[in-house]
């Protein structure tokens, strides 16, 4: 659809802008620093379906390894890049107000790699405010499905409830902001992000049931890094 093409074009432009900022900071002060560590947090998930599927938020977990490289300080802005290797749970939980007795939960497990521009403002030792933005790719590894007995009295939709993931490669854009406390004992980060998938996990041709099946995830996480 034209709307999706426009959204994808805007997303690509934002990614290019986010990565261009550090690359144009060559006239800044050299501040090379490499840090590694780990992260963990929660996902608040939903899935964008077309046709629409009534649902409520589904909570999952995320966590993994983080590496960050700081390259420049451009005026008051610290510029760098961050990459992560995470386990992350996505999916959806159906809720129909007309039939509240029905329960269907699908949890989908991924290995994800966010590639982020890191832009920060603040003190070398103290508190910094930072912004992250960039592309994210993911690989589907497994899922679980929970369907209660109330469905025995209703006809379910096989294309919605019984179909396996068809596109195991997931990609999209992610971004967010947070605070970092830099100490001699290490760096502690608290962050909120949003992930918007540009890919569908079901096939979406004209003959398929869904024309859209994409993840949307609010992420809250804590990260610890040491130099």
PLM-predicted stretches and their roles:
Residues 1-31, 39, 222-227:
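Bacterial Sec-dependent N-terminal signal peptides
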Residues 25-68, 227:
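Short glycine/proline- and aromatic-enriched beta-strand/turn motifs that initiate or cap beta-hairpins
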Residues 26-33, 72-79, 122-128, 182-187:
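Short loop/turn motifs that connect adjacent beta-strands in outer-membrane beta-barrel proteins
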Residues 31, 90, 170-227:
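Predominantly the C-terminal beta-signal and adjacent terminal strand-loop region
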Residues 32-34, 57-61, 107-113, 127, ...:
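Residues that define the transmembrane beta-barrel architecture of outer-membrane proteins
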Residues 34-40, 77-83, 111-113, 129-137, ...:
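Transmembrane beta-strands of outer-membrane beta-barrel proteins
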Residues 42-46, 87-91, 112, 121, ...:
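Transmembrane beta-strands of outer-membrane beta-barrel pores
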Residues 47-54, 89-109, 141-169, 201-220:
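Flexible, solvent-exposed loop segments that connect beta-strands
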């Amino acid at each position: 659809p034209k709307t999706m093409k426009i959204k994808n074009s805007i997303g690509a432009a934002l990614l290019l802008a986010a990565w261009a900022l550090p690359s144009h900071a060559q006239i800044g002060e050299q501040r090379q620093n490499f840090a590694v560590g780990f992260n963990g947090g929660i996902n608040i998930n939903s899935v964008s379906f077309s046709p629409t599927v009534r649902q409520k938020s589904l909570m999952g977990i995320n966590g993994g390894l983080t590496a960050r490289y700081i390259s420049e300080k451009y005026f008051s802005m610290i510029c760098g890049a961050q990459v992560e290797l995470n386990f992350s749970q996505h999916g959806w939980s159906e809720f129909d107000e007309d039939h509240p007795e029905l329960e269907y939960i699908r949890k989908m497990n991924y290995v994800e790699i966010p590639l982020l521009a890191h832009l920060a403002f603040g003190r070398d030792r103290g508190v910094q405010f930072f912004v992250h933005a960039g592309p994210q790719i993911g690989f589907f590894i497994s899922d679980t499905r929970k369907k209660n007995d109330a469905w025995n009295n209703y006809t379910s939709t096989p294309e919605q409830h019984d179909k396996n993931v068809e596109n195991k490669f997931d990609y999209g854009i992610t971004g967010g902001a947070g605070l970092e406390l830099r100490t001699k004992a290490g760096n502690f980060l608290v962050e909120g992000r949003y992930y918007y998938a540009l890919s569908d996990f079901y096939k979406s041709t004209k003959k398929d049931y869904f024309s859209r099946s994409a993840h949307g995830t609010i992420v809250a996480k804590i990260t610890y890094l040491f130099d």
